[in-house]
C-alpha cells in the first residue's frame, strides 16, 4: 500500500510541476469551481467540464487529468486537449490508446482507513479524490512544449475562496523514488513552505531564537586571575634493600614539578617559603644528600 501511495504522490507532483510551468488562467479556475459546485449539488449527474482553452488563456497544450471528479465514478476529464490532438497524448500519460470517455472503470476512489482496515466515516474530502488507476509508475505528465523538468510546486491549505496557496520557490524532486523516500524528498519543501507561511502571517512566532556564541579564540585566551597557591608539598620515597624498606620524607616547593627520586627541587616563582612547619621538624633536612635533577642520582 505504501508503494501505491508513493506512486500516486509522484504522479501528483508531476501534475503540479506541469501546472507550475504554465499556470492555468483565472477564467479556467472559475469555470472549474462552478462545475465542482454543480457536481456537489447533483452527484448522480455527470457534467462535462472540459472546454477548449483559447490561445493564451492556458498554457497546457497536453492533457492533464483533472483532480475534480464525481464520487459515482465518471469519465476522466481532459483539460487543454484541442481538436487536433489524438490518442498519442494518452500514451504520453501511460494510458492505452482507447476511448478515455468510456473507460469509467479506470477511475479509483480512495477513502481513509484506520489501522484495522475499516473505512473511516465522516470524512467528505477523501471521497472526492479521484485518481486514474491506469497510470504507470514511471509515466510523466507533460505541461507544454517548454515544460520545466526541474521545477516543482507545493500546494498548501486552500483559503476561504477555495484557491490553493502555491510555493514557486521549492526545490526539485527526483523522478524516481520509493515509498521510504517520500518523507526525505518532501522534507526540504515542507520546511521551505513553513518558513514562507510563517513570514507571511501576522501572528507572533512561537519560541525563541537560539543564539549560539562563537567559539573562543585561542590567541586571545587569558590566563587565570587566581594565583597559584604558594607553599610546600610533602613527598615520600620508598627504597627496597633486601628485606628492608627505607622511607624518606621531605618537602618541595609547590611550584616545582613532581619527579622521581629524592630530589630537592628549587622554587621557580620566587614566592614559596624556604621552610614550612613540617620542614622545621624534619631532622634529616640538613644531613640528607640532595640531588637537583635526575642525572645527578648515582645508579
Curated annotation (Swiss-Prot):
Q: Which Gene3D superfamilies match?
A: 4.10.80.340
* Chain residues that bind Zn(2+) 2: 255, 267, 269, 272
Q: Which InterPro entries match?
A: Paramyx_V_Zn-bd, Paramyxo_P/V_N
**One GO MF term:** metal ion binding
Q: Can you cite a GO biological process for this protein?
A: symbiont-mediated suppression of host cytoplasmic pattern recognition receptor signaling pathway via inhibition of IRF7 activity
| UniProt superkingdom | Viruses
Q: Give the Acidic residues compositional bias ranges.
A: 146-160
Which parts of the sequence are annotated with region: Interaction with host STAT1? 110-120
Q: Where is this region: Disordered?
A: 41-99, 134-168
Question: What GO cellular-component annotations does this UniProt entry give?
Answer: host cell cytoplasm
Annotated keywords: Host cytoplasm, Host-virus interaction, Inhibition of host innate immune response by virus, Inhibition of host interferon signaling pathway by virus, Inhibition of host IRF7 by virus, Inhibition of host MDA5 by virus, Inhibition of host RLR pathway by virus, Inhibition of host STAT1 by virus, Inhibition of host STAT2 by virus, Inhibition of host TYK2 by virus, Interferon antiviral system evasion, Metal-binding, Viral immunoevasion, Zinc
Residues the record annotates as the site (Interaction with host STAT2) are 240, 246, 248, 250
Per UniProt, where does Zn(2+) 1 bind? 232, 251, 276, 279
Q: How does it assemble?
A: Interacts with host IFIH1/MDA5 and DHX58/LGP2; these interactions are involved in the inhibition of the host type I interferon signaling pathway. Interacts with host TYK2; this interaction inhibits the type I interferon signaling pathway without affecting the type II pathway. Interacts with host IRF7; this interaction inhibits IRF7 translocation to the nucleus. Interacts with host CHUK. Interacts with host RELA/p65; this interaction inhibits the nuclear translocation of NF-KappaB.
Family affiliation: Belongs to the paramyxoviruses V protein family.
Q: What does this protein do?
A: Plays an essential role in the inhibition of host immune response. Prevents the establishment of cellular antiviral state by blocking interferon-alpha/beta (IFN-alpha/beta) production and signaling pathway. Interacts with host IFIH1/MDA5 and DHX58/LGP2 to inhibit the transduction pathway involved in the activation of IFN-beta promoter, thus protecting the virus against cell antiviral state. Blocks the type I interferon signaling pathway by interacting with host TYK2 and thereby inhibiting downstream STAT1 and STAT2 phosphorylation.
Name of the protein described by the UniProt record = Non-structural protein V
Q: What is the originating organism of this protein?
A: Measles virus (strain Edmonston)
- Mind giving the lineage of the organism this protein is from? Viruses, Riboviria, Orthornavirae, Negarnaviricota, Haploviricotina
